[in-house]
Amino acid sequence: DILPDKVAAWQYIEKTAREISAKYGFGEIRFPTFENIDLFQRGVGDTTDVVQKEMYTFVDRDGPSITLRPEGTAGVARAIIENGKCSDTMPLKYYYIISCFRHEKPQAGRSREFFQFGTEMFGSNSPASDATAI
């Protein structure tokens, strides 16, 4: 829970993240909270702890298994491919501020829903690009 007395601090952090990201040419991307489980099995690895033990996965009424996103990178990569952005001028630079979900053993200061700010850069393998993303 983020109660009213803490919301201003959260908004400040989010605003700062957005401003810095925009300054370095990153565009905000939004993508679904639920994704097909195959995305994470392929992207994260089907033998990883995240896929094997930590994801919330459900069978959709239409049949396929869907998962609450445990992280952001796989969803961004899927969005780029499905929306035909691979042929755009490189590098592609995106950022996101999202809720993620992991079925981890609850610990002090850690919950199963957490907030993640991330940057992703596709189409460049230079150390300078890595530094920009960081």
Regions found by a protein language model. Give the residues of each.
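TRNA-recognition modules of translation machinery and tRNA-sensing kinases, especially anticodon-binding
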Residues: 1-134
